[in-house]
């Protein structure tokens, strides 16, 4: 079992968000998973230019580090999403990475994978970031196990969150191992599946990769 953690804070080793992602990964490792941490802020990932090439070929033509990182995420069983709260949303580094995954959401490539989200804020708005990240993951077909955050303005908040983060890592491993189903998330998955089934069918003569992906999955029935 492999779990990958994505950190989108520009603070590097000093990042509070990195501390929480690392704590989740520690809990997952203790529960038996192999882990990897990716620093999206250090990675060379440019903006999506909306060329549509990934719809046709399955590969982004921009010559940077996105394809390699994304391949490792797709190969993992679980994903830990981590971003600081910037103006009640994710950091620019995280949004840039997410925006490069149009092919991923079209093809529901997180189907069968499990994830969770963490965030750190100066105030209480980290929950909005956690909900956003889990929402993105579910929209891509994944199952969200949970999420948490911390406020640096509240004494003891980070320490408490780190303890909970380790527990969340263990819970993530359990969910993957048992193939846990979250009934409340199924309507989201069905809605996304139907939406993109229609879209891919509509563009089947142009989006060869995506049409063949759906066909091979048996989702076009």
Positions of predicted regions on the chain:
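N-terminal beta1-alpha1-beta2 submodule of the flavodoxin-like/Rossmannoid cofactor-binding fold
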Residues: 1-103, 163-174, 179-221
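Short coil/turn segments at secondary-structure junctions
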Residues: 7-8, 81, 117, 153-156
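Short beta->alpha junction loops
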Residues: 39-42, 148-154
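Short, glycine-/small-residue-rich phosphate/pyrophosphate-handling segment
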Residues: 92, 105-151, 158-160
